[in-house]
Amino acid sequence: MTPPQKSKPKRNRRKIYKILPQNQCPSVCQICRNPAIGYHYEVPSCNGCKTFFRRTIITGRKFKCFKVSNCLDGNDVIDTSKRVCRACRFEKCVQAGMNPMAIQAEAKTDEGEELKKLIAKKFENGEKLNDGTVFFNVHDRLNQILGKLIKIETKLEKVHDNGMPMGFLDQRDLSTALSSKVIYNNMEIPSMSYTPVKISKNTGLPKRRSRNFVHSSCLASIEYSKTFDFSSAIDISSKIILLKNTALSCANLTNAYTTFRKLKSDTLLYPDGSIYGPPRRKNGPLIEKQRSFLQNTLISFMTNNVDKTEYILLKAIVLCNPAIIDLPYADSKHIQREREVYAQCLFRYCLLQHGTLHGPARFSALLSIFNVLENQQKEQKDYYLYIKLIHSQKHKDPEVLKKKCISVIYDQIMD
């Protein structure tokens, strides 16, 4: 026979107001020791502590004591007209036995519902809350996500802004680039090849070299994608499908933001200040059309006066695109979950910045930039295909065609 299992001791949850004399109002609040006005959530308390506990549970707020978590200890009456440590006040409410399940109002956030259930479970099992238990409110969650994205953006600025090392070529394909570790400086690109300086036949002088900012901006988008949670959950083939559909749009967003906020220009520029697109000496209807559609995202940024936070969240949403047809369903779900987080953050940010009246309209205006991005990406790829076709007819030698290509990675993205 197996010995009988010991039952887990349960905390006595008999309601305090049922063991005290009838028709007698408690005199002291068990949290702040001010005069009590009655029993609230099964504990003698004042109106202030009752409201504080209810509001904390409903919103799921997070508080932190900056001392030693004993701000409300002792027997002295707490002056609630002054600022009281909210972390210690809430801990005192829990220790006194306030029952979150007695709150009739529903929690307004997932964090609030989680907090409510956790405290109720601890009470049932006769346990105490762990020291340092953390619950995020909306502001904390927004700041946490933004902090992570800003850190990533800052670290990848060198990849986008510095261009390729002069005279060096990145000859990797998209699969190889995605399989390697994240790089934060173009000098770290593995297996770069060096191209000797060419001498002009006409002048006898060395030809001007390009830093290939077009390639480095797309490379920055690829490195950016590796920092997201979904990157470790989906396979390499899904990553390639995703980047072929999103890398160029992310690069266009970064180019527009760099021009608008950093270089303070109303014409799209490369990070070194030179004009983006075909050289000024080239002209013609197709060239002018290209110059025109390259400005579209920048125009949207200027029209909507997009700030840094909005840009960073928009870029994350653009990258996390689960609606790509060829993506496997399981992989698209990973991407969708992450996209929903960034979309919610952008909506919350719009509400914080523009209020409940104008916030939703601001959110819609920012999302409308996606249409501009989609159209610009389509025009860029169509134009690239056209130019590629012309070169293939003009140059039959594959080696010559290879030299005309910006990079293997860019060619795959534009395909």
Curated annotation (Swiss-Prot):
Residue spans binding DNA: 26-105
One GO term (biological process): cell differentiation
Cell division recorded as keyword: no
Protein name: Nuclear hormone receptor family member nhr-153
Residues spanning the signal sequence: none
Record organism: Caenorhabditis elegans
A cellular component annotation (GO) from this entry: nucleus
GO molecular function: nuclear receptor activity; RNA polymerase II cis-regulatory region sequence-specific DNA binding; zinc ion binding
Zinc finger (NR C4-type) stretch: 29-49, 65-88
